[in-house]
Amino acid sequence: KEELINIIKPDKPDPEAARVLQEILGGHYGEMRTMMQYFFQSSNFRGKETQYRDLLPGVFLEEITHVELVQNTINQLLNDSGESIAPGNTGVDGAPLDDAVRHANPHHFIVGAQASLPVDAAGNPWNGSWVYAHGNLIADLLDNLILESTGVLQKTRIYEMSSNQTF
């Protein structure tokens, strides 16, 4: 049975939180960049040091699980959103899309079939030019340190901004 590295505890639909969490998936310091950066550094590493030859692909594989976890969290936050007639979940005319357009990323509903997308919180597409693979192991590891540190900072900020237990 396939399981995520962390169990997601469903709370309540929250398309606003899903939109914000897109930054952690497809933003400049997001998991997609981190995954691809380790992938390219791993593939392009030509050094003879086997410990680094083993480390980089290992971290790349771990980052795949992070992308999957963030995608599943976004999807959980989008589940059942825009479908209820509860106050605050529809517009004045009762149309489910009203709430999605007003508070969420409309692309989650229109393009993404109410699921995660390879974009940041503003809806900008993920950008491969953010990936750094210099061919210099020390420079690559320093870039990774900044990337990982900034990613943790952003995740912490988003976690502290929401009371939704899905995070």
Say what each PLM segment does.
Residues 1-167:
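Non-heme di-metal
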